[in-house]
């Protein structure tokens, strides 16, 4: 009948705007996107049974920034990275053997503004994405029109090398939101929220090389429409990109 049936729910989150499942399918992490107080952003950890759908609450940690909006976990399940949109920062957490989160081991702040005077009045960290080889953490900052490539050492207590960051600027007012990689790990796709632009890069030798920018024709055809883009996915065969 194609009906959806609830199999489990939890009350241990508030406004869970983004979540990530560990590669082994055993643990689920969700951010609590609180925006009323800079001290109230939280991230919650759950043990997850992928056969029954049951979620068992493990613990919660503060995100150390307002409006957490993204979370990712490395392929080994050792580090969780989350982005704080209004907090202008991102936090890194270690996990223990049960999947629980330690308090944040790194809190890394950004600054800067850009052309959109309504939205880009400060840094807005929007996503934290691990490179396919797990050697880098890519951080999209919508507020200052910058994509950051941070060297990342999975086993280090402080895995993010802040001083070693590479910065890729996008055109003023674009607002980079999410980045993802092709299944063959040869290309990266950067979705820009504010101007609905999709940028394509070659990923080779630990570096991004710009290739092209694609525009939503729906936005182009409506001169006065509000532009916006929110998520991006690549098909398993790598032939299609969806935004």
Describe the role of every protein-language-model region.
Residues 3-11, 55-62, 102-112, 159-168, ...:
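Beta-propeller fold detector
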Residues 1, 46-53, 93-102, 151-159, ...:
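Short loop/turn segments immediately following beta-strands, especially the blade-tip
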